[in-house]
Regions:
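N-terminal extracellular/periplasmic Venus flytrap/periplasmic-binding protein-like
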Residues: 10-13, 24-34, 42-44, 168-271, ...
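Glycine-rich loop/linker segments at domain edges
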Residues: 12, 16-19, 102-159, 226-229, ...
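Active-site pocket-shaping loop/turn-to-helix segments
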Residues: 14-37, 41, 59-62, 85-99, ...
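Conserved beta-ketoacyl condensing-enzyme motif
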Residues: 22-113, 118-134, 190-203, 296, ...
Length: 402
């Protein structure tokens, strides 16, 4: 089996996913184009070598629909010969796109592939693509359907994480993100988004709130109380997990991931393809895995999939230097830390989605790039990237510097 190497990665800054966000006037297609074009230009890439473009997108409808990967490859001038495919595994779509691209190379069927993701949440709203799970009783009842926020609160209740625990984690995410930006740790990977006149619309993540503290978070009301109690989802949670007497609602806008716009792209290929292109590999894909998990708890997939991917790679937890666990909700990361008895010094060291935002289909590709940069900066060797996923799933990838 061939090895799949990571040659480079880029991302856009993350804009607030609201009408007043700096990227609201930029379509998902344009965001994807920015990332793909930057990847091509900074590597002087002969796109005749690119066999496919794989992009994750969680709500691929309207202007973000119709196989946005193919459209993005065309507008980014990759050439008529470069195909594209859009994939969707909810919040892990960007990481799964990279895994999909890596698998093509490892199977010997492709020489060079781009993986990544895009989401314009300010223009195509969360949940715009619909689906059977929340509306069809045939699946909703059987799988204990409840909104993700209620599931996050169920995790916090079941595993003993208080409102203060979740808020303290959020404060740390803000501090780490702000410091990483202040120290210039993202400058080599983030490409600004400009308008048609070349004027910069956004060059840094704009969702961050560096002044966040426990006092300011304490003033926010829990977001999912009414949904859980009036909507009946608390009762569903207790039915699914009878060891929980009642759901304690601890999550709110300040300790949950931010709604943002953004895109990312990662260049992968075989050793031979890299040599032909004159590129130096930065890392290799060691292993990747996917699992299904309890759909009621929904967001605990990173724990189980981490065990699976480590076993697949023949590694122990101690073999991993850094972990990126998507900060969908504070309790997701707290449960991961608890399950593996991990120190915070190895997890999300540059901050995460609570501070910088979670552009759904792009996030997996973004955080893989972030941790690769950190491995290089600190001289460390291996990292594990994982995301929780709606409907109860998990995806994980292990990368290793070369």
């Amino acid at each position: 089996m061939a090895e799949a190497y990571i040659y480079d990665h880029v991302r856009t800054p993350r804009g607030r996913g609201k009408p007043d966000g700096s990227l609201h006037e930029v379509t998902a297609l344009r965001l994807a184009e920015v990332a793909l074009r930057a990847l091509k230009e900074r590597n002087d890439l002969d796109t005749r070598m690119v066999d496919d473009v794989v992009l994750g997108c969680v709500d691929p409808v309207g202007e973000a629909g119709g196989d946005i990967a193919r459209a993005a490859a065309l507008v980014a001038d990759y050439g008529d010969h470069v195909p594209g495919i859009q994939i969707n595994r909810f919040c892990a779509s960007g990481l799964d796109a990279i895994n999909f691209a890596a698998a093509q190379v490892m199977a010997g069927q492709h020489d060079m592939t781009v993986g990544g993701g895009v989401e314009s949440m300010s223009r195509v709203g969360l949940g715009a693509s619909g689906g059977a799970w929340p509306v069809d009783p045939h699946i909703a009842i059987k799988s204990w359907f409840m909104p993700q926020g209620v599931s996050a609160d169920l995790i916090a209740t079941k595993y003993g994480f208080s409102r203060d625990d979740c808020d303290a984690y959020a404060v740390e995410s803000q501090k780490r993100s702000a410091k990483s930006w202040a120290d210039g740790l993202f400058k080599n990977s983030v490409v600004p988004v400009r308008d048609i006149n070349g004027i910069t619309l956004l060059a840094t993540d704009e969702h961050m709130r560096p002044s966040t503290d426990m006092q300011s978070l304490g003033q926010l009301k829990a977001s999912f109380v009414q949904m859980g109690q009036m909507g009946g989802f608390d009762a569903v949670a207790v039915d699914a997990h009878p060891d929980v007497e009642m759901v304690e609602h601890v999550h709110h806008a300040g300790n949950s991931s931010g709604i943002v716009d953004g895109a990312a792209a990662v260049l992968l290929g075989s050793k031979e393809a890299g040599e032909k292109a004159g590129l130096k590999p930065r890392a290799r894909i060691r292993a990747f895995a996917n699992i299904g998990s309890d759909p009621a708890l929904m967001l605990t997939g990173p724990v189980d999939v981490t065990k699976k991917v480590l076993a697949r790679a023949g590694m122990q937890l101690s073999d991993i230097d850094l972990f990126e666990v998507n900060e969908a909700f504070a309790a997701v990361v707290l449960r991961f830390l608890q399950a593996f008895d991990l120190d915070m010094s190895r997890v999300n060291v540059n901050g995460g989605a609570i501070a910088m935002g979670h552009p759904l289909g792009a996030t997996g590709a973004m955080i893989l790039g972030t941790v690769l940069d950190e491995l290089e900066r600190t001289g460390k060797e291996r990292a594990l990237v994982t995301l929780c996923i709606g409907a109860g799933m998990g995806t994980a990838t292990i990368i290793e510097r070369v």
